[in-house]
Swiss-Prot record:
<dbReference type="Pfam" id="PF02182">
    <property type="entry name" value="SAD_SRA"/>
</dbReference>
<comment type="similarity">
    <text>Belongs to the class V-like SAM-binding methyltransferase superfamily. Histone-lysine methyltransferase family. Suvar3-9 subfamily.</text>
</comment>
<feature type="domain" description="Pre-SET">
    <location>
        <begin position="319"/>
        <end position="441"/>
    </location>
</feature>
<feature type="compositionally biased region" description="Gly residues">
    <location>
        <begin position="183"/>
        <end position="198"/>
    </location>
</feature>
<comment type="function">
    <text>Histone methyltransferase. Monomethylates specifically 'Lys-9' of histone H3. H3 'Lys-9Me1' (H3K9me1) functions as an epigenetic mark of repressed chromatin.</text>
</comment>
<feature type="domain" description="YDG">
    <location>
        <begin position="73"/>
        <end position="243"/>
    </location>
</feature>
<feature type="region of interest" description="Disordered">
    <location>
        <begin position="783"/>
        <end position="805"/>
    </location>
</feature>
<dbReference type="GO" id="GO:0140947">
    <property type="term" value="F:histone H3K9me2 methyltransferase activity"/>
</dbReference>
<feature type="compositionally biased region" description="Gly residues">
    <location>
        <begin position="793"/>
        <end position="805"/>
    </location>
</feature>
<dbReference type="InterPro" id="IPR003105">
    <property type="entry name" value="SRA_YDG"/>
</dbReference>
<keyword id="KW-0539">Nucleus</keyword>
<feature type="region of interest" description="Disordered">
    <location>
        <begin position="182"/>
        <end position="209"/>
    </location>
</feature>
<feature type="region of interest" description="Disordered">
    <location>
        <begin position="552"/>
        <end position="595"/>
    </location>
</feature>
<feature type="region of interest" description="Disordered">
    <location>
        <begin position="611"/>
        <end position="647"/>
    </location>
</feature>
<feature type="domain" description="Post-SET">
    <location>
        <begin position="941"/>
        <end position="957"/>
    </location>
</feature>
<dbReference type="Pfam" id="PF00856">
    <property type="entry name" value="SET"/>
</dbReference>
<protein>
    <recommendedName>
        <fullName>Histone-lysine N-methyltransferase, H3 lysine-9 specific SUVH3</fullName>
        <ecNumber>2.1.1.367</ecNumber>
    </recommendedName>
</protein>
Amino acid sequence: MATIQLTDQQRKVLHEVACTTAAPVLDTASKDKIKQLLDDYDMRKAAMGSKPGANMVLPGQVLGEAGPFLDYGHPPGVALGDKFKDRGQVMVAGVHGTTVRGIHAPNAGSEHFVRGAYSVLMSGVYVDDEDMGEAFWYTGEGGMDGKKQVKDQQMASGSNAALKNNCDTRTPVRVVRGFVQEAGGGEGGGGGEGGGGAKKGKGGKGGGKKEKGLVYEGLYLVLECKMEPSKDGPQVCKFLMHGLPGHSTVSAKVEYNIFGNAGSAYSLHARRLAGAGAPAGGKRARKAAQDEKARELARQWMLSEIRRQYPGPELQLEDVSGGQEAVPIPVINQVNSERLPTDFAYTREYAWAPGVYQLVAPALRLADEEMLQFSREGDRGGVCGIAFNRHIAALDRRLEQEGRLPQGYEAHLEEQYNAAGCLMVTDPCGVHECGDGCSAKACRRNMQLSAGVQLPLEVFMTESKGWGVRCREEVPAGAFVCCYVGQLITDAMAEVRKGVDHYLFDLDFFAHIYAEIAEKGMQAVAEEIPLHKIPPVLSVGMIRQAQINAADAARRLPEQQPQQQQPQQQQQQPAAGGAAPGGAAAGEQAAGGAEGGGAYGGGGAAAAATAAGTAPGAGDNMDGVEGPAAQRSGGEEAAAGPGSSGAAGGCGYRLDGMVTREGLAQAAHALAEACDALARSVADGASTNLGGENILAAIEAAKARAAAAATTSGGAAAADQHQLEQLDRAAALAAASKAAADAVKAGDPGAFYLQPIISRDEEKAAERAAAAAAAAAAAAGVPPALPSTSDVGNGGTTGSGGGGGAFSNRGPAGCAVGSPRALAARSGMEAAAQAAGGAASGPVAGPGAVEDHGEEYAPMLVIDARTTGNVGRFINHSCDGNLTIQAVFAGVYRSTLLYHVGLYACRNIPQLEELSYNYGYHKQQQQQQQAQRGGAAEKQFVMQCNCGAVGCIGNLM
């Protein structure tokens, strides 16, 4: 399928018009009015039965004297992506004011005529329409006899002249597309080739019942108009239309806090993506390689092609991945002599900072258990994304039959990748890929991220932005490019690196969802997205509670435990392929009606624990853990059954058989060394090799240097003040980690789990460290007494006075962190209701003190790709990027705390065009400003943005 290339001037025009165009009016009154009109139309139509032409007469009767909507822009009460059953509904809603013609334009004598047409409808009648989704060539009206063009069209009069006026006056036009949707899933646009659905996706053709309808695509700008011969011979009018950024479904930016039809990057369409077929087999031999020998031959051929294309010194490395990726990724520098950082190590999968996995394993285990129940893997016997999709789609259909499906919500797709392996739509609730045990064709296609990098990417030196990434081939919209991976550190550790490390990526995709629920309220969210689709997310209080329970269980570990047979070397991450340990069920499985289903034991935490080795202290391996709670069935809550198995709740939490005191001591020591190195890197600016035995003394020296430099100017003083604050954070983190390691060594293994994980806990870090030292000195070697789990939420403490001890369960300012909750099994709706502050069933408490100290939902883990990462680490920011971010549950990472960050093409990308995505600096600024309400303003890190986009915001945080 051909790609429309826009000029810089055309992109500039699009941006200028988008900035001056009013947003859709979606207030309750407007939406209620549209719903009332549509209900009236449907009732009248049902009463008329199958009378011919009913949908042509009824709209006028319903609208009465008001008549159709005769204005430009978005019709009030209609959202992007809203679907309609027929042209009558479209007219009643004010989207397209005629049921007969494809172009709705004012009369020639009207004052509106000079501005242009109101709307156009893509029905597929004209064979000369060329539909590329975000842009298309629209054929004018006239000269048709049946389905054949028999006469020349005229540009000088009628509706065609009106569309030409749209081009001249830069007036956006509403676009409505017809589609054909099979009972099995795929969706095809009437004007294009159609979508790749579940069966025979091209053109929307295939088996099963077909349902025709129309969808409001939003506002498009007419960029060009011309006359050219039609396929039948006579001249036709052609109009180049392109989606208006932010005002059309194919180019609307989706923020994490929007549940509606415009989501976290570009919304992709099945109809547009279906035409992007897979490349020819001869072009990329790796596609045909089925065995290791064939893959190696293909790899050697690709390496020879790279050497042939870059024969000179500009080829610095033939493959930066060192053979880890299926395709070699060369490093090219044709600009200067700069080379890659010498301390950079390539990894295809996540790597864990020393001691971090062991620290967060209890929270990961709980998140895995909740996700296990939400995805109903226990019912299917394994991980099958297709089965999950079909289950959610079935629940959507049930809501639709009951008339409770949110207006404007697009039903969940049973397959999220089309036949070419391209993502058909971004999903704010995450994409579920299949596991290794799945063998059906549809399941294998549902493993795009799991397969790793498949495109011929290059790391290259740009003119002004350092290293960047490009592809030697055209990238079709929706194609998987790569993940963003690196070393996993805690949020508290990442906070220390703020301003020093520009390769940090918060795993907060789903934390935004629940923060939005808390802000909007349950009812508002339920009107935008079915609650059964929202995955479970652990709040800050629940994460802290899981750590407290683990600490309590660790203190009950026996002093001496029998030695277990251990692997000789402990790994720090799961296998590169992301495959979970343990056998996979062979053959196809009828899991929920899916074409095959996979199975492998345990969740992400379990798999990661096994892959990380079973050494004492390596973390939970899930052995002996009870199965998930009984699954619910039927109703809207059928898929929303996240909950704990009880093993993590209260005093029932057990660690025996999984970790040992010796193992925890080793993990605590490793983490303390990692935090020490991290603090040194802050004190030394960026280096991780700061001299000096005492990190606290080194930081004090750095603070003295910063204070001395602060006398030069007001600006320098402000900058140094922030540096002083960062040094304080670094000192607090290092002190808390060392105090925890000392406490574990002295005989209190529970102290390991009570270290700061989320950055807000750092405020208490120094106090905990000081209390630890005082308690240790007072007890003369006796470990400090810590509160038991029974004290949680009751204000009770033991041991070190009212302060709660060195590693107590008390948060900043002595408040209980999140009023830690009893972790009873909850449905997705109950969890969401809890997020909104509503009542929840069972003993689950309200948000409590969490809200008093910032957001209730925050990331626990952060990706740091500064020295350890993959090709995604080199992809630059752009205010108008051509890639989009999508959270993907795949491999062993299948919880909302730990998942894959996938980067997908959000439009067709020409070969050798630099790949980029929006880092979200503007969102960070907004969040920081919100966090500063009522407090002192914090120094923001400002860098110049060199992305070159038309709508560049200029400065980055």
